[in-house]
Amino acid sequence: MIVVSDATPIISFLKINRLDILNKLFGEVLLPEAVYEELTSNSTFQEEAEQVRACEFFKKVSVGNSETVDMLMRVTGLDLGESEAIVYSDENKSDLLIVDEVRARHVATSMRLRITGTIGILTAANENGLLNKDEAIERVKILRMSNRHISETLLNSVIENLK
């Protein structure tokens, strides 16, 4: 299974200290170079950067067509990491793109890429027995308090749908 991720979902899983969920659900997660750099080059977040570097299930990959990335950024206003994640997913016919930003999700969906986000992965972790309902709800609440843009409506929907 080819799974590609943007930086924001990885940051969310760092915030809830559960990067292991990505490994358990997907085995390997591909990070385009710009995404990897975004996660590992900020001197303010060295501890988190080291956690990303230490994860053997993250694999840094290169996008084949940088012109397509540049064009996508110009046309959509997406950042470099989001654009590389979308282009790499499209070039390599990924099975899943993990992305949270609304605009990036719309672009990916319009390109017929299969997407999920942090909440979808937490739901899948619950369905696969990696988190019980209370643990999943607690993680979503932590993310909400960490300014991860989770509305009250989404929180209530998650609570309602967890097992």
Regions found by a protein language model. Give the residues of each.
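Short beta-strand and adjacent tight-turn residues that come in two discontinuous sequence segments
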Residues: 99
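Acidic, PIN/NYN-like endoribonuclease modules and their adjacent C-terminal/linker elements
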Residues: 45, 105-163
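Active-site-proximal, substrate-binding regions of enzyme catalytic domains
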Residues: 1-94, 102, 113, 153, ...
